[in-house]
Amino acid sequence: FMNNGNTFDWNQQTFPKLLQKVGYQTAIYGKSHLRGNPKGFDDWAVLPGQGLYYNPDMIFPDGKRRIDGYCTDVVTDLAVDWLKSKRKGDKPFMLMVQHKAPHRNWMPALRHLDLYADQDLPEPPTLFDKWKDNAPPARNQELEIDRHMDLNYDLFVDLTPEYNQPASQKRQDRSAWHNMKRMTEEQLKAWRAAYGPRDAAFHKAELKGKDLVRWKFQRYAKNYLRCVKGVDESLGRLQKTLKELKLDDNTVVIYCSDQGFYIGDHGWYDKRWMYDESLKMPFVIKWPGVTKSGSRDKHLVQNLDYAETFLEMAGAPIPEDMQGKSLVPLLKGESPKDWRKGIYYHYYEYPSVHMVPRHYGIRTSRYKLMKFYQFDEWEFYDLKKDPDELTNLYGDKAQEKNIKRT
């Protein structure tokens, strides 16, 4: 995928198909974000595109239908039902539970709207970063909390189904506003009861400058964490179900995502850059009897390693044309001498949403080298001494050997 919206070929080889060949029952519920109906799954129900947070449409093998409720709960219900009533007890299984949350514009469950309302979250140390030492592209994007975050469409200030006003930027995400049109009167009433008084207090304060940025950050970060709370509850329900079915000691549970995110870091929101806040992503695993509880691994891994990992866990053959590396040795506490020393990243979408320019680069355990090739601009960081990537060392003669080595 070089651009968002490219079509996925479901006829090609995939790890779910390979697991089916060795006897696994497979299922997927939730976000697929790949055009076309899933293949390689014995049962499935997926959201159209990004889907909606409230009362989402779901596509089933027999067609599309609306399911009332909050999306995270809906997806979890489908997964729990599959485990309890559709799973074949005589077969191993692979279940993918893929949530919309916390994709922006994030809309929390009604039960979480008051979460964190009585406290201030700690600000990232780079909230007011002005990218003075970065290459020029960092100063010419459209993802600043200060200048680009939309009060209405991003933060729901005074947002109603009838709002429909011009956005602050051409490519503004209006998904939350579109979702409001699907909410029931009861849901809207609860939503307005929570946000109405906060919006009134915001207007009364007439905030400007850094105070306004701080308010935006608090509103944004809290809504993010409220959505994550729903995902956390989902994981808890799934773990509880596995325990009830006496499967918890023989099931590998993996939590991961597709990228990191800026929540005020460097004064930004959204993702796309190669800086660590968006480059890094969570990968948490419970492998009973194999992976030591509470252990951490510092090897460089990528999501292209997942397929080989799952296949090796299942005892399935790994095709030679797969490009990742199985994580099984790392999960067993081993340190392979031939493990990769660096990873490659490439962002293609420009001009596009948030106007982050095209760039590629290499990250090792200590250094990062990036090139914005449309503008012939480079950046180089020592991540040990400068984990926030504030001091661009490209052009520093003392770093020439490190740059060449990277």
Predicted feature descriptions by range:
Residues 384:
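Residues forming the ATP-binding cleft of Hanks-type serine/threonine protein kinase domains
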